[in-house]
């Protein structure tokens, strides 16, 4: 708190405090500490290394037959100025309900239907049935480190989710 007062002052209102906190978090999340962009793919884009034959085949599959790049786009994001592997849209992929999801064990009133809960995604937030089941297209950055996969963690491995799409 002393550092906060030193930076933002003693007279900051509750609203301005929240705005300052939000700004500080957003700045940190944009920093190189959180987003170093140091993958082999980044080095390849910068001309600092070559991809192996197998990696090039994978990239071609990602861009073409796999259709991955339709949603996990390979162009620089306007805001980030880097490839984020997401188009920031919401899609319904039909991922099955995950019986291992800890939410199913949450008691009422937070989960009133128990194991029969369906996550309606964006549709629940917007109260719009045409948006039911839509979830944000995630980034694929460091994807090998972020298991499980799918909006609800249904897929335990990358192989499982790739097979689901195929």
Say what each PLM segment does.
Residues 1-56, 60-61:
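Extracytoplasmic redox metalloprotein regions
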Residues 37-164:
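Short glycine/threonine-rich turn/loop motifs
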């Amino acid at each position: 708190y002393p550092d906060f007062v030193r930076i933002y002052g003693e007279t900051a209102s509750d609203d301005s405090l929240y705005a300052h906190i939000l700004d500080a978090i957003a700045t940190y999340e944009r920093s190189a500490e959180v987003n170093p962009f140091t993958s082999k793919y980044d080095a390849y884009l910068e001309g600092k290394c070559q991809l192996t034959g197998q990696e090039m085949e994978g990239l071609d599959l990602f861009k073409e037959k796999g259709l991955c790049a339709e949603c996990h786009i390979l162009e620089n994001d306007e805001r980030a100025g880097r490839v984020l592997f997401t188009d920031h849209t919401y899609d319904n992929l039909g991922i099955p309900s995950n019986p291992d999801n800890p939410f199913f064990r949450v008691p009422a009133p937070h989960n009133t239907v128990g194991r029969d809960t369906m996550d309606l995604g964006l549709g629940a937030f917007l109260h719009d049935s045409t948006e039911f089941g839509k979830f944000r297209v995630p980034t694929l950055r460091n994807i090998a480190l972020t298991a499980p996969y799918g909006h609800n963690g249904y897929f335990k491995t990358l192989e499982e989710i790739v097979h689901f799409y195929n």
